[in-house]
């Protein structure tokens, strides 16, 4: 339990940031799930559109510190690779 005033404030701040980060992470997961569902359905046009929407969300999460930039880049790269393989 936090005793000092500054520690109590830090606890409140952490709780707020955790809520924001959780919402952001959830939003990213939803966008990625839409891409994966489109890939599973085999519709290349829908998958490409979903990827185009998901990419900025992933990079924004990396910019905001929700995930590491390399993680976001890796996810975008792998999704793009899978979407591209649908056309082949």
From Swiss-Prot:
Pfam families: Ribosomal_S20p (PF01649). The keyword rRNA-binding applies. Keywords: Ribonucleoprotein, Ribosomal protein, RNA-binding, rRNA-binding. GO terms for molecular function: small ribosomal subunit rRNA binding; structural constituent of ribosome. GO terms for biological process: translation. It comes from Sinorhizobium medicae (strain WSM419) (Ensifer medicae). Belongs to the bacterial ribosomal protein bS20 family. The gene is rpsT. Residues 64-88 are annotated as: Disordered. Binds directly to 16S ribosomal RNA. GO terms for cellular component: cytosol; small ribosomal subunit. PANTHER family: 30S RIBOSOMAL PROTEIN S20, SMALL RIBOSOMAL SUBUNIT PROTEIN BS20C. This is Small ribosomal subunit protein bS20. The keyword rRNA-binding applies.
């Amino acid at each position: 339990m936090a005793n000092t005033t500054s520690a109590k404030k830090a606890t409140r701040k952490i709780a707020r940031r955790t809520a924001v980060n959780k919402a952001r992470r959830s939003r990213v997961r939803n966008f990625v799930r839409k891409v994966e569902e489109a890939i599973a359905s085999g519709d290349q046009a829908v998958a490409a559109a979903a990827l185009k929407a998901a990419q900025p969300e992933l990079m924004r999460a990396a910019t905001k510190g929700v995930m590491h930039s390399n993680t976001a880049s890796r996810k975008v790269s792998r999704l793009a690779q899978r979407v591209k393989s649908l056309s082949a």
